[in-house]
Every structure is written in structure tokens, then in C-alpha cells.
Amino acid sequence: MTAVQSELISAIRSIPDYPKPGVMFRDITTLLGNPRAFRRAIDELVHPYAGTKVDKVAGIEARGFILGGAIAHQLSAGFIPIRKKGKLPHDTVRIAYSLEYGVDEMEMHRDAVAPGDKVILVDDLIATGGTAEGAAKLLKQMGADIVAACFIIDLPELGGRKKLEALGVNVRTLIEFEGH
């Protein structure tokens, strides 16, 4: 484990049995509230793409907005909010995606991405990968070229990374936690 990984892990609060028994919730609000750790996380996520053409950063609601906005700023790229259905005011494109216990829908503005735009997809954590997979499919459906999907946390036992890689998406994560 690197010093950066140790720093990030120590900045994340772990809450047992939330939102239900048997789940260990990884709360990044403590990382976001720590200026040094927040900057370190953003710098580590951005570093591999400095000097790479990135047109847009797409953030998945809600923590992906915080991280994605900061990453877009660092890369001088635009930002695309990917939201739950019914939350965007203009003409949207929507996709259904699988959750652990059902199906939901997410959307983005139809004019948010142009065919061929180089896009980085961002969220705080990848677990089962259903939400990230849906967002990646939505972006690809609109013609985006996904440069990478970036997350602070990976829960590798839940297989989300593999879902994105099966779509041809390069996945970057900073730290891993065991379990759920």
C-alpha cells in the first residue's frame, strides 16, 4: 500500500450495518471535508489524464458531481451531470439500469455530449457496477468515446470493475476495500 492510499483510507469513515445489516458503508464525506485528502484524491484521479484530450467529465449523481466537477476543472473540460430520471429540465435521453434489488432509470441532456467527445466517467465508489454500467451505456449510446471511468473506491468482490471492462472501458480506482 502506498502512502497516498494510506492517507485516503484514513480519511474515509466506515459505518457498519448501514444502510442495512451486513453492509459496511464507506463514507467519503470525511475525505471531502479534509482539504489535503480531497486535493490528493482529485490529483490522483486527474494525473493519468493530464495532457490527454478530454472534452467532458460525466459525474453520476450525487457524489460523482462533487468529484467530477473538480476533475473537469483540473482538465479544463466541460461537465455532464448524469441524474436520476425526472431531475433535468430540458430534452433528455434515458436508460434503465439494474440495481441490487430492481431497476431504475438515469438520464442526461440530449445535447450534453457530441459524437466523438472524449469523456471521463466519475463516481465515488464502484460496487456491483450497475449504475456505472448504465451511465457508460448511456454515454456510448450518445456517441461518446469513454476515456476512462474513475472512482476513489473499488469493492472488488462485487464485480463492478469487470462490468465496465466488458464494455471496453478503462477503469481507474485509488483504493480497495474488502466486502460490501
UniProtKB/Swiss-Prot annotation:
SUPFAM superfamilies: PRTase-like. GO terms for cellular component: cytoplasm. One of its GO terms (molecular function) is adenine phosphoribosyltransferase activity. This is Adenine phosphoribosyltransferase. The keyword 4Fe-4S does not apply. It is found in: Cytoplasm. Catalyzes a salvage reaction resulting in the formation of AMP, that is energically less costly than de novo synthesis. NCBIfam families: apt, PRK02304.1-3, PRK02304.1-5. It comes from the Bacteria. GO terms for biological process: adenine salvage; AMP salvage; purine ribonucleoside salvage. Gene3D superfamilies: 3.40.50.2020. The gene is apt. Pathway: Purine metabolism; AMP biosynthesis via salvage pathway; AMP from adenine: step 1/1. HAMAP family: Aden_phosphoribosyltr (MF_00004). Homodimer.
